[in-house]
């Protein structure tokens, strides 16, 4: 029998582990995702008073079987109007609720309950026929998904001044795949177009050398080896709302680690508009090309334009006398001097993502960073 871990942590460290097989050829790389995310969560509790510490230790020791039900607190929905006795449905924000699974309704450490989920659709949890909420819950109570997990490494404890710190790591035992398309696409690729993304670029270069290879038949062959250091960067995400945190989580599952590429703007002023355009659709725009040494070098580059909350991805089909032609019209109203960024086709350069969820006065703050690598096309 699984036992609920009912204690709200101060921080949650979440690790998502994917596994991608990558094969390199002279024309590019081929990637195969070998499994969905393995979800690992480390709960950190800073406890005072001592009575709560005693409850934590007793709860852990009494679970001899080691099977746990772990609430996913960072995807909890606040019930602004509470919940009533005998209700059979609960309206929640999008999260990993599963038909046949369970959800936790939580008002406080002495008032909570688990409910079974018959169906979950359009943000509504429906309880099985004959089931209902067993008591009233006040406004400000929380509802969150619950997943089965094990704790293979035990409970860690540290004693400080007027405080006891606990940590334990849950390994979720059910498969997790929350993939969804939350971004607009261009050329079949998701475009990261929100303003909570920061990228840092490291310039690449070309290295050439000649190797003498012994072919095993008594002679040496001259082999030319050419290595191109692809564009690399680091992306950092900080999500302050439930909606953006959920969209980010789905984005990671959609990418499946290193498997799926996406478009990432540099968010630099790579090009500056040389005229006002819009609001009517347009497919040509003048740019300030004074600092472009070789205009032909930008042909084929993907670009990103964002002005006043509107944004679009496109590419440069041609350039002539400072006027770039786009393959299809865009409708963004832009002004002289507005920046246009280049956009790189990248993939994550890791199969392991480390996310931090910190509890705040008004919810949860989530953040993580990951390296990205340009995908050769």
Q: How would you describe each model-predicted region?
A:
Residues 13-52, 171, 197-249:
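Short secondary-structure "cap/edge" segments that initiate or terminate local elements
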Residues 40-44, 87-89, 163-167, 230-234, ...:
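Intrinsic-disorder/low-complexity, polar/charged segments enriched in Ser/Thr/Lys/Arg/Asp/Glu/Gln
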Residues 25, 159, 165, 234, ...:
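Small/flexible residues
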Residues 48-133, 187-189, 194-198, 242-333, ...:
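Autoprocessing Asn-cyclization modules and mimics
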């Amino acid at each position: 029998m699984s036992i609920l871990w009912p204690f709200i942590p101060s921080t949650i460290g979440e690790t998502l582990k994917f596994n991608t097989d990558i094969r390199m050829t002279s024309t590019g790389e081929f990637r195969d995702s070998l499994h969905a995310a393995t979800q690992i969560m480390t709960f950190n509790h800073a406890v005072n008073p001592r009575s709560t510490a005693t409850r934590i230790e007793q709860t852990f020791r009494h679970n001899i079987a080691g099977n746990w039900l772990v609430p996913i607190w960072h995807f909890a929905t606040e019930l602004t109007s509470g919940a009533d006795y005998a209700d059979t449905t609960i309206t929640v924000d999008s999260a990993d609720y599963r038909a046949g699974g369970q959800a936790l309704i939580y008002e406080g450490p002495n008032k909570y309950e688990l409910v079974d989920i018959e169906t979950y659709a359009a943000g509504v949890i429906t309880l099985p026929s004959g089931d209902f909420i067993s008591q009233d819950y006040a406004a400000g109570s929380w509802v969150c998904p619950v997943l089965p997990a094990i704790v293979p490494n035990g409970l860690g404890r540290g004693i400080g001044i007027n405080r006891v710190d606990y940590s334990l790591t849950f390994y979720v035992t059910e498969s997790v795949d929350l993939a969804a398309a939350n971004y607009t696409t261009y050329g079949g690729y998701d475009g990261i177009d929100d303003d909570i993304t920061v990228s840092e670029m490291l310039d690449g270069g070309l290295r050439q050398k000649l190797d003498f290879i012994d072919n095993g038949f008594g002679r040496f062959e001259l082999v030319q080896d050419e290595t191109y250091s692809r564009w690399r960067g680091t992306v950092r995400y900080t999500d302050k709302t439930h909606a953006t945190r959920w969209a980010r989580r789905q984005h990671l599952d959609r990418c499946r680690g290193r498997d799926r590429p996406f478009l990432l703007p540099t968010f630099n002023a790579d090009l500056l508009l040389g005229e006002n355009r819009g609001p009517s659709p347009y497919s040509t725009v003048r740019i300030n090309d004074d600092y472009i040494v070789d205009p032909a070098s930008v042909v084929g580059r993907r670009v990103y334009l964002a002005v006043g909350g509107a944004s679009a991805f496109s590419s440069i089909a041609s350039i002539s006398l400072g006027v770039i032609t786009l393959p299809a019209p865009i409708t963004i109203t832009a002004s002289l001097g507005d920046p246009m960024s280049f956009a790189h086709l990248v993939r994550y350069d890791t199969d392991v993502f480390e996310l931090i969820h910190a509890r705040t006065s008004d919810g949860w703050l989530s953040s993580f960073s990951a390296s990205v690598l340009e995908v050769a096309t």
